[in-house]
Amino acid sequence: MADYNALATQFTQFYYQTFDSDRSQLSSLYREESMLSFEGAQLQGTKAIVEKLVSLPFQRVQHRISTLDAQPTGTTGSVIVMVTGELLLDEEQMAQRYSQVFHLVNNNGNYYVLNDLFRLNYG
């Protein structure tokens, strides 16, 4: 079995660097069966997911990861990843806290996001 913690770290670094620089480039990480739950809105499919991410009402964003936990799922090499962290949006000085969960599915050694759940954490 591959080192799932290293996989989770590499994936999240790539995902957030891409998200922060050009969200439209995230399409290669999703498939038609992929699902995104974003602040209660549920979307399915690459096109719908990327359209949602691109339409978010900010120009600049910076993700700062606070915690990252991963576990293997099943026998196919898939991995579930839970991330908590902070977002800095546009010119805001106060970071917003968030939680995000990814279910990464192994497809012949290449991984894609089957499930993506995102929530801002208030309070």
Curated annotation (Swiss-Prot):
What keywords would UniProt list here?
Answer: Cytoplasm, Protein transport, Transport
Task: Give the record's GO CC terms.
Answer: cytosol; nuclear envelope; nuclear membrane; nuclear pore central transport channel; nucleus
What does the record list as GO biological process? protein import into nucleus
The UniProt entry lists the main location of this chain as cytoplasm
Domain called NTF2: residue spans: 7-120
Which residues are in coiled coils? none
Q: Which CDD domains match?
A: NTF2 (cd00780)
What Gene Ontology molecular-function terms does this entry list? nuclear import signal receptor activity; small GTPase binding
The entry's localization annotation reads: Cytoplasm
Role noted for this protein: Facilitates protein transport into the nucleus. Could be part of a multicomponent system of cytosolic factors that assemble at the pore complex during nuclear import.
Its protein name is Nuclear transport factor 2
**What is the source species?**
Schizosaccharomyces pombe (strain 972 / ATCC 24843) (Fission yeast)
